[in-house]
Design a protein with these regions (language model features):
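Second-shell loop/turn segments in exported
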Residues: 57-64, 153-161
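A structural "domain/chain start" motif
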Residues: 31-73, 77, 84, 176-182
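Surface-exposed short loop/turn segments
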Residues: 39, 81-86, 93-138, 146-157, ...
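Short coil-to-beta-strand
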Residues: 47-49, 137-143
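Short polybasic linear motifs
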Residues: 12-13, 21-24, 28
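N-terminal secretory signal peptides that target proteins for export/translocation
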Residues: 1-14
């Protein structure tokens, strides 16, 4: 009997310490909040509720007609998917406007027959970001993206796919600079 009693006496302090530590841990966890954001946005939703994304007109020398609408909608869609901001045409707490300033083809590598083997398609967009909540975060900047394709293919055959890729890249860069702060 004395042997069993010794074991239970030794367990009592360890059990008490465990209970105390567990209680302290529970109190700390209930008083602290840990938040993980996987979209990278650093928006204070108590002060910033909306973003307006104006249409981006195409002022480039070479014009691909759907580009203006595709870019504007691509940017709006990204903010709708990645944030809780209300996306408006105008009058938002955050404002994005700009224009397509460049859409050009450049010959890249030269093949053995002295003709271009690859062509680079470059899209350039000038953006004005106005933060009406924190004006010091407003900026004006140009964004570019490019894609290359085999020169044996016609631009009309690859244009839609290449533009979609470039629009996605530019929209993500704009998003990162405006609300993600990366």
């Amino acid at each position: 009997m004395t042997f069993k009693r010794k074991i239970s006496v030794c367990r009592l302090p360890k059990l008490s310490v465990f209970c105390i530590l567990y209680s302290v841990f529970c109190l700390l966890c209930s008083s602290c909040a840990i938040s993980f954001k996987f979209n990278g946005a650093s928006i204070d939703y108590t002060t910033t509720k909306s973003i307006s994304v104006a249409d981006f007109p195409n002022n480039a020398a070479l014009v691909y007609p759907p580009l203006s609408n595709d870019l504007s909608e691509g940017i709006r869609d990204l903010y709708q998917r990645q944030t809780r901001l209300q996306v408006n045409q105008k009058g938002g707490d955050l404002e994005l406007e700009g224009e397509i300033t460049g859409y050009e083809l450049t010959n890249m590598s030269i093949a053995a027959d002295s003709y271009s083997a690859e062509t680079k398609l470059t899209l350039t967009v000038h953006v004005r970001f106005i933060n009406n909540v924190r004006p010091e975060e407003s900026f004006e900047k140009s964004y570019s993206a490019y894609q290359t394709f085999d020169s044996s293919r016609m631009l009309t055959d690859v244009q839609e796919e290449l533009c979609a890729t470039m629009i996605k890249e530019i929209a993500e860069n704009i998003y990162n600079d405006t609300v993600a702060k990366w």
